[in-house]
Amino acid sequence: MSGIPRSLLGQCAVALLGANARSGLTLHHAFAAYSSAAAPAQSAALIKQLRERSGAPIADVKSMLVEHGWDMDKAYEALRKKGLAAAAKKASRHAAEGLVGASFAASAASSGGSSSSEASTSGGGRGSVVVVELNSETDFVARNELFQKLLREVMGAAHALGPAAALMSARTASGPSVSEAVTALAVQVRENVRLRRAFRVDSGAGGLVFPYVHQAAAPGLGKLASVVVLAPEPDDKAQPLVLDKVVEGRLGKLLSDWCLEAQRYVLEDELTVDKLMARLKKEVGQPVRVASFLRVQCGEGLGAKAGGGDFAAEVARIVSEA
């Protein structure tokens, strides 16, 4: 600037002051409106922390921090309220994707006399199996690590409950209630997320319970889950011969379609479940029966989404409503 005459610099300064005076602004205010000087030195770190804490988009995080004077707690509360309002608007949207989770927890008697707090996504035995269905709008969200973490936490909460307890008000391992955690996830992923149903199957006295997950996206999580309880066969199981003949004749086809014992074993097509149970009887030296079973498929009964399957249109709609 050494080459610019001082007189010209003075004229520019006077002109600028005059312009600001006419507009009702001081030079200081005009400068502050276009300056980031008010942001603290650790602004990038604050944005990162609030982004991780809230899961909100970076643009929303930064705008809320600026609006609330870079106060982390106030900005988080504002983001939370904004997210809850957005989640409430999305609550009516069709959510038939998601995952079904199944996990086993051993009973106190089978875990050395102390109640087992650790649930397992594999194995089985004397104890209980919990099956939970958590729905989302898209399969993309169902593959999200946060979605799968929440599903596991809900299963853990279900194991800790009594049969008549309310699951939605139960506490998750991370602290909030199941209801609060589901809403928080919906805010983070910006989709409708809902806990649709949950089951708990106990092995019962002398029985064994086993979970199975099909089309697994992660250990214990998939699109379909089933639970089977095996129990010793009562000694007085005497079936009239005439009933056997009726089943074998007129109802044979119906049973092969609808009865578990008549279903073909998936690993050996010529082997039915009842024949498999007979094989198990020889191996253990005791008659064994299927005491009960459960089958849960993700999205079962929800039907197709209204409006057809135009994926591009659906993505455009979600983006416009986000």
From Swiss-Prot:
Gene from which the chain derives: EFTS
Protein name, entry field: Elongation factor Ts, mitochondrial
Keyword set, alphabetical order: Elongation factor, Mitochondrion, Protein biosynthesis
CDD domains linked: UBA_EF-Ts
Disulfide cysteine pairs (residue numbers): none
Lineage of source species: Eukaryota, Viridiplantae, Chlorophyta, core chlorophytes, Chlorophyceae
Compartment(s) where it occurs, according to its Swiss-Prot or TrEMBL record: Mitochondrion
Note from the entry: This protein may be expected to contain an N-terminal transit peptide but none has been predicted.
Gene Ontology cellular component terms for the protein in this record: mitochondrion
